[in-house]
């Protein structure tokens, strides 16, 4: 995480760091079955970590009496399926499946291809377009099925088809939903906070609500009248000026809060593969330790509502992707804390993701295991007025 941030979804197991499952754990899940660990020196992860993982895995295999069943294949160069890596992988599979010869030491020079013609020999420093050309001119060598697609086989089903079936079965078996259940599933804890650095300037009251875990929630309040709370996925609260002006004109005292991962609290160390929503890194880091960001955002909104209302219920206005956390907060807070819920341009329901596999989703907008109990839009039925 220090090097480059969280990685692909298949490498992400919710709560894995909380229960001690790391890179070594992936290897040990297979032990004592044969495992070849392939790595490039210039890959995303520091190579020193690869060596540490390989050393510990080798020790574990040795303790299990399967010393020859684990090996490391490393090569110079960046993230890529290099020729030397492919050569060793084929040799490894040959040994395991066809009784081929032993590979020898973990780092074997005979598996590295050397030469002076960089158009023909892999230096380990880049991609190999000649291989792509070979596949184009020899299409038969690149396909196993008659058409080149397993989806053309009789009875073939995609992973999306399987997910839809599982999702429908889970939806049909849902128990009765309660605020307590939502708190438990989303991990919504106490909404404690302290008001820090309050000041007034240009008829706006400014403050920072410091949550119990130290997270700062910047808030700005303007106007007079019945309290309203605005939360948004906007990077700059100034884009909310027309909405705030309309609410103030309607006789509202409006508080705008930057809940975690949005606005002033959005900046992380790394962009998640360049995704425009910077809170993906925050969501994955939370998920690695078993925390859903949606639940934490709901806590932030509950705290901001208590601050904005001063003992009175507030109207909650949620814009964009902030609607998911707002729906959770409104459901568990109820009418004692919220007089209404208005959703401006909210994201689709979670169920829409199963209906259309082309729709993107964000780790930041989902709650782990929640589908077995509810869809996030189920939480809005009593209070909401979507636009």
PLM ranges: what are they?
Residues 1-7, 25, 313, 326, ...:
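Serine-hydrolase-like catalytic core of hydrolytic proteins
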Residues 4, 31-33, 38-218, 222-226, ...:
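Alpha/beta-hydrolase-fold serine-hydrolase catalytic core, especially in secreted/extracellular enzymes
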Residues 1-12, 16, 57:
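Beta-propeller blade termini and top-face loops
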Residues 1, 306, 323-335, 341:
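Short glycine-enriched nucleophile-adjacent loop
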Residues 15-20, 368-371:
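Short gly/ser/thr-rich secondary-structure transition/capping motifs
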Residues 74, 321-322:
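Long hydrophobic segments that form regular secondary structure
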